[in-house]
């Protein structure tokens, strides 16, 4: 369940608890002479109390007022005044804010009065728990305890997954539409690592039983957070590695930052045993400038055996001096920019409600939970069309992603990061900073997942939900008539994951007109290579920049790709869907007149999974169509599938390497932008469930081998998008966010413009 960073429940018990909390924060009380309901008021320091509550506090010395903000609630209050402005509306304070000894104090009831004012109705009590709700902290503990008490358990087991086991799809849809409970008991899916061995378990939380225990042959598990500490320790305690560092003039191993990287698969040509649990280590030098990524220790790779917890091999190639130029990215030493405040207020509260993990906004309803591997999973997405809830998508999430590099050198050839499949992007969720990562009016939601020990771990501010202005929805100015235009609003669900040097921002964007967008943004710090060249005018520059761009003295940003795949279990007005291609064509005019040609369209139904695996062609309209449902004029209802709806980098048209590469054969999902498969609840990830060191394609390449029919069936759409990242100077030392966009757009799904009511009289 989410723990919203928002308002306490409006109950006397909650208000009492809040007052007790303030008193236990170490905040000194004093009795103000101001009367509160006929008696003295107990006062606490305003700034400390509000910041502990999660609000931001700003003092304007010129205007002599405080601006206090939290979750879209904005308060402007002056000292010694019983009147404040709450989201632009005047409210009466029981006790004014006062100064004493240069410190502002508020009454112990101030937070309750302001944030319990009744303006905010965002959070609604969940009366019937959703069967897709993520496991609570208690459920995680219970599930792991059941495993630990079983005869199968051994000390040292680690957990890569503890998640809710989804009930059958038809039961979940029935719950979403009618409220009828599912038949399946509450269950937990668990993946355990026993050394290098992977085991899948299923726990029944109702009966408190271990229902299954299944070793998975040949699988290598995910990289866990404690593996980071293992490789750092292995590097720091290796005499051989210390010698290699000394050759480069580095004598303090504590200044070396080791990064744990998966080794990939090269059919033994890399000299690594396939049955070992290994990581490669590329290191950086911490020079105290706050950016060790700018100081790569080039030409040196260590290999660590995670079971032995020691370094087993060193690959020491070229002696390239470590770039030592200070390269901070936090603004130090720069003149600050004066920016006037930009405030977003919602004076009458929010237009959406959150009940448990379910969100309602205008005509949209959906459920969202955070997964430790792929991040947010959106489920049972429906649109209320004039009083009728219509199915659009059963489940949508990031399926997987890969970041392959194109440099063949010893420290680079193996770099092809499966960020979600190898590292778990949900586990690496980056807490969202209000006013920076998301607007001030966002509601921030906590989430709970299991760590590698199986213990529940709370992630603060894991996701943001906010409404925003998005330009005009439509406009027309008829000559001699009043202008007609209306504002477009969007609801955004945002999540950020930091995987090493890169930070990824994912937005699920709901539009009032039925369009659903997915935006993926890459920011953070480029993975750079140390080289000899300082400028492009040196003799070494041509070879140094063969696989990248010279960004700074002795620094090359290597060319690579960011390829994302989204798993979208679309149910367009039901489960009987088909993939349709619509191609605009030029045909001769056979009707007479001066024109010689016409524009027409040709329509084709795609029959099977292998025919559906296609490169993106922007001139073809691709639809997921329900031929059993029609709009008012008889056109079958559809949603358009647009895997690349624009971006700020060159589009990744496919995998930028030869088809004889092992990477190509293991991970074919990245070379096609559209895949459609027949629904199978076990097919979750485009790279397969266990891609680490895999020697074959266990994802979409395998899923489509049977070549099932996708006509009038329950289909899953997999959209691959992304960018080919050619580095540029403006991205160093930190990269402005670069976006790529996916769109799912209604196509004859409605009978008319679905937002005509936006201009209806209120």
Task: State each model region's role.
Residues 205-210, 214-223, 246, 286-376, ...:
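Extended effector regions of multi-domain proteins
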Residues 131-176, 224-268:
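Short, non-transmembrane alpha-helical segments in secretory-pathway proteins
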